[in-house]
């Protein structure tokens, strides 16, 4: 069974992203082993290296960076749940990704975003960034306006009306996670 990380891409107090990530993790748990990685638990120094980490395997790592890299390398695939800040992702998420070397190379990443425009620009930004880390982004993503905070309770339960029907948010998530696990299985042959 695939081991999937759900990454909470915001550290703000009262963040909607955490609720969304809880909902996502519940569905991932139905199809794979799951662990939620909260960037609050991985405070990283600001990335300022001259050589990109993918091309500098002998770089000296700060202990916080080593902890992050060791953890992220454990997984077969990822779901990044991100808010949209200023038409992109949060600075803390971008910094966490910039610190990666080959830990996510040849591994799939599903994207779930929220924001005033549904998080579309955050997803577009990640589709540019992640291939630089060697990751494979899934062609589909989930987009939510900021009202998603009212649609999901603190326990990660989606309102009933959003769970019903073939085009519901719940059905879309089930499909996205199914695709993620299929990509994970397929890409495992590339990584061996």
Identify the role of each PLM range.
Residues 2-31:
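N-terminal beta1-alpha1 ligand-phosphate binding loop
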Residues 3, 33-35, 108:
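Residues at the starts of beta-strands that form the adenosine-phosphate
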Residues 29-35, 136-137:
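A generic structural motif
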Residues 40-58, 152-153:
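N-terminal beta-loop-helix "entrance" segment that forms/cooperates
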Residues 56-136:
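Helix-loop-strand module that forms the ligand-binding subsite of alpha/beta enzymes
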Residues 138-192:
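Glycine-rich phosphate/pyrophosphate-binding loop and the adjoining helix
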């Amino acid at each position: 069974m695939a081991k999937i990380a759900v990454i909470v891409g915001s550290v703000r107090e009262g963040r909607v992203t955490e609720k969304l990530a809880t909902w996502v993790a519940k569905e991932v748990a139905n199809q794979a082993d799951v662990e939620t990685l909260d960037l609050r638990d991985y405070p990283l120094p600001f990335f300022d290296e001259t050589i990109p980490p993918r091309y500098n395997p002998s770089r000296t790592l700060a202990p916080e960076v080593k902890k992050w890299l060791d953890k992220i390398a454990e997984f077969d695939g990822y779901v990044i749940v991100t808010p949209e800040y200023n038409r992109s992702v949060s600075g803390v998420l971008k910094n966490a990704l910039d610190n990666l070397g080959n830990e996510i190379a040849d591994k799939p990443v599903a994207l779930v975003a929220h924001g005033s425009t549904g998080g579309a620009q955050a997803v577009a930004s990640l589709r540019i960034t992640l291939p630089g880390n060697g990751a494979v982004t899934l062609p589909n993503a989930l987009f939510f306006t900021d009202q998603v905070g009212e649609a999901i309770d603190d326990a990660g339960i989606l309102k009933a009306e959003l769970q019903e029907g073939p085009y519901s948010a719940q059905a879309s998530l089930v499909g996205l996670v199914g695709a993620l696990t299929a990509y994970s299985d397929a890409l495992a042959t590339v990584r061996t």
